[in-house]
């Protein structure tokens, strides 16, 4: 058997990782400024993470959600306190797509309606409802096509109001910051309008914080910069620092009943141990403040570079839009400086999503490399 060839791969084989660094099978060291799509939130092989997952594995790694798993309650309590959503409930699952599937489903159960508003450049996952809410026709199979998902131009209040006027809306799903779309930040007034329209029309406000959450922007959730509250919040990626885990934060107005949602692996002991390690480290190392401070530092160092058209960022979530395609720069950062970065659906946008505990010295290595390549005209 061979692997199903769906991933374009760099010719790299990493065998060790620590903090913001990776080593390949030739013992060459790489600086990781992408974290596998914002997954590595507290750094590779963080001691607290390794210890908690190892200790848990030595006791019990898995049983299904047919028995009490008290460590799930510990995750919910810690997450509620650090996020400011203490009165919400947590449903644990395995990935971002699964979190969004359950969010859209739960919203429809609650609202008793079918139509969902989503936005241009959105990415919510590759499974049934999640991919139907994603603005990329190339990954939507015929069986996933649905007229229950209405695409509205991002940050366009007039179009949003029209969609509510013309349809019975079950939910609005929006990313706290669009990641794949190129780090597009929703305007405060736009999020406020979503909140007010959802209240007026008894629709559910779903905020997808899978990439933008868990302290990446300097707030625990990106939408908290706008001081609005979502009814449902979806999480994954940085939640487990590499261990597959996702979750749905659910407002008190939603009524739970047995069988309404379900998962085999979600909330297993190891996933919970990983999640607790991340939350404890974010709090202990004050990583929200580090994300704010170093994000501002990176912006100040790069904002006047002549190669750059625009920098869109909050905290350590960066979309650096160049005046040309970012592919040559990204390739040379990797081949000449051993620095891993990301791209986006817009070909000119370089994405930077480092661990939240990255240091100024580590960022300086990227800044120096960027400026050298910028001056060289690539």
What are these regions (language model features)?
Residues 1-378:
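Conserved N-terminal phosphate-binding loop of PLP-dependent enzymes in the Aspartate aminotransferase
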């Amino acid at each position: 058997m061979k692997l199903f060839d769906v991933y374009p791969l760099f010719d790299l084989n990493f065998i060790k990782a620590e903090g913001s660094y990776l080593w390949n099978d030739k013992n060459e060291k790489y600086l990781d400024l992408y974290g596998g799509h914002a997954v590595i939130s507290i750094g590779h092989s963080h001691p607290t993470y390794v210890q908690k997952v190892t200790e848990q594995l030595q006791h019990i790694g898995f049983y299904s959600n047919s028995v009490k798993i008290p460590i799930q309650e510990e995750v919910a309590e810690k997450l509620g306190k650090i996020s400011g959503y203490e009165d919400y409930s947590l449903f644990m699952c395995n990935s971002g797509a699964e979190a969004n599937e359950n969010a859209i489903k739960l919203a429809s159960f609650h609202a008793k309606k079918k139509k969902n508003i989503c936005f241009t450049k959105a990415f919510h996952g590759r499974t049934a409802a999640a991919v139907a809410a994603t603005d990329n026709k190339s990954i939507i199979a015929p069986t996933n096509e649905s007229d229950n998902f209405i695409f509205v131009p991002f940050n366009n209040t007039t179009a949003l109001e029209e969609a509510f006027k013309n349809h019975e809306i079950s939910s609005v799903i929006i990313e706290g910051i669009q990641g794949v779309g190129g780090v597009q930040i929703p305007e405060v007034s736009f999020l406020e309008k979503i909140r007010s329209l959802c209240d007026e029309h008894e629709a559910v406000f779903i905020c997808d914080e899978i990439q933008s959450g868990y302290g990446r922007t300097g707030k625990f959730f990106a939408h908290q910069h706008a001081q609005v509250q979502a009814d449902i919040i979806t999480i994954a990626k940085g939640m487990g620092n590499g261990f597959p885990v996702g979750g749905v934060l659910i407002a008190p107005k939603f009524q739970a009943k047995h069988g309404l949602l379900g998962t085999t692996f979600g909330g297993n002991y190891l996933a919970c141990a990983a999640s607790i390690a991340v939350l404890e480290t974010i709090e202990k190392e004050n990583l929200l403040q580090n994300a704010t401070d170093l994000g501002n530092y990176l912006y100040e160092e790069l904002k006047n570079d002549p190669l750059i058209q625009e920098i869109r960022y909050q905290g350590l979530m960066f979309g650096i839009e160049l005046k040309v395609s970012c592919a040559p720069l990204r390739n040379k950062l990797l081949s000449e400086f051993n620095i891993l970065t990301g791209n986006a659906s817009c070909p000119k946008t370089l994405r930077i999503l480092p661990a939240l505990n990255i240091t100024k010295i580590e960022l300086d290595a990227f800044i120096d490399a960027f400026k050298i390549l910028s001056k060289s005209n690539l």
